[in-house]
A protein has these predicted regions:
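Short N-terminal "domain-start" leader segments
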Residues: 1-9
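A broad, low-specificity signal marking well-ordered, structured residues that form hydrophobic/aromatic
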Residues: 6, 16, 28
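Short aromatic-glycine-(Arg/Gly/Cys) micro-motifs in beta-strand/loop hairpins
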Residues: 10-24
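Generic structural motif
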Residues: 23, 35, 89-91
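A short, exposed loop/beta-hairpin motif centered on an aromatic-Gly-Thr core
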Residues: 25-33
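A short, charged, amphipathic alpha-helix used as a generic interaction element across diverse proteins
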Residues: 34-47
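Short, charged, surface-exposed hinge/linker loops at domain edges
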Residues: 46-91
Length: 91
């Protein structure tokens, strides 16, 4: 872990906008529990869309779901490395 100064443009709950040093454009900070909820929602959307959407559309939806889960997996690994408990239950 390191500490750096970031520019905070908005600290809205679950949608903080900040710029990390070295980045040209700001990004959005999504809290871990919100990211987990988005992953679960994407799972449900894929389940509901299977057999309903055409193959290309389903593949795009599934790619979105996989990208979200990839972010969540990275988040969980980093928190684990720093012995920080997850802000959600995976039960």
């Amino acid at each position: 872990m390191r500490t750096e100064i970031v520019e905070i443009y908005s600290d809205a709950t679950n949608a903080a906008v900040l710029r990390h040093p070295g980045r040209h454009f700001p990004g959005v900070l999504v809290q871990g529990d919100s990211l987990y909820a988005l992953c679960r929602q994407a799972d449900e959307a894929c389940e509901a869309a299977r057999g309903v959407l055409d193959e290309d559309a389903y593949d795009e939806l599934n790619a979105l779901r996989n990208a979200l889960w990839s972010y969540l997996t990275h988040y969980k690994v980093v928190l684990g490395e720093h012995e920080i408990p997850l802000p959600f239950s995976e039960c």
